[in-house]
C-alpha cells in the first residue's frame, strides 16, 4: 500500500480546513508533517446525521484531512492532548434512526444509491424542509436513505453550557436558516440535518459537555470513518460494497478512533496507535453532550473548534487507544488519593506490617467489539498485553481500584485501573500520567 505522506519541513502549528467524504486510510494525502510537540488547529464539521443524509459520503462522519507527525513510525504511539474543544453550532438535530430500503447496498452509511435512477453515491441537493428534502441531482428524486423514528431539534447556549429542545414551529424557523444555525466549516460538503425540522421532543433542557466522538490516527487500510471501531466495524465483514473486509483484516488494520467516549474532551489525552508512517492524525464528530452508552444511536452532533498538541511515544505498540481522562472524569475507585488519605494508608500499612505501598497512576484502555462483553474482554486483554500484568490481575485492579464503563452500545468500553508507576515508566508515558494527575506533588 502506498502511503500518501508529504515530505516537507516540520511545522509548529498546522491549521486544517479540509475534510474527507467519510473515508479514512493510507491512500489519503496527509498535511504536514507537524513537529513532535506541535499543535493542530481545526474546525470540525458535525458527524452522523449530516453525512448520513448526504449520499456522496462513504462513511458516517466528515473528519479532518489527516496530519502527519514528525518521527511517528509504525509501532509507535502518538499522544493527542486536547487543549480546546468548543461548540460552534447554535443548533443541531438528532434522534433515533431507521433505514429506507432500496436506497443503499448493504450499509446505508457506506453505499447509498438512488432508488429511482440507480446512481451510487449520487450528488444531491436540498429542496425545502422535512423528511423528503434531500434530492438526487442526477434525476431529481428524493434520495435520503435515513428517517427519524423519533427526532428533535436542540438549540445551544455555548457560553452557559445549557441547551433546549424546541417545538415544530421553532424547528421550521431554524430549518429556514441552516447555514446560520449549523455554522458548518466553509469547505464542509454535508447537508445540514436542520433542514429536516423533526421535532418530536420539545422543552427538554440538557447540560452541555462537548467532546470528540472520533479522534485518532489512520487505520492501515481504507475504511469508512464511522466504522473504525470493533462494533460498527463488524458491518464491514464480508460486506457487499467496496469496503468489505475479513474479520482478520478489520482487527489488524483499525485504530478504534470512533469511540464516542464522553470523557474525550478538553483536558484529556488520547494515546493512539501508529499503523501507517506519520500516524495521520484526524478528528471530528463533536457532540455537544452525551450520556454513557449513546443509547439512542446518535447524540447531538455539532460543528466545533479544536486545538490539539501532539507527542510521539517511541516504541509503544498499541492495538487501540489509551485514554488519560481528566481527573474529574475518572471513576471514583481510580482517583489518586490525596495527602490525608495517603497518610491514613501509611498508618494502615504500619499497623499490619505491610512494608511496601505501591506507587501508581490511573490509566484507561479503550476496548471495542461486537457486544459490550466482547468489548470488555478486548479492553482487558489490551491492558494485559501492553502492561505485561497477568489478565487476572487486571481483573482485580479494575474491580477494587478502577472500573469498567460503557462508552457506546453496542460495544465500546473504558477499562480503568491504577497501574504501577514502573510499568508506566517502561511504556514511556509516566510523565504524562504524573502531569495529568498531579502525582509529582500532592494530589488534589
Regions found by a protein language model. Give the residues of each.
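N-terminal, charged/glycine-rich beta-strand/loop interface patches
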Residues: 2-262, 273, 277, 337, ...
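Redox cofactor-anchoring modules in respiratory/redox and cofactor-processing assemblies
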Residues: 247, 277, 282-360, 365
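Short, charged amphipathic alpha-helical segments flanked by flexible coils
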Residues: 270
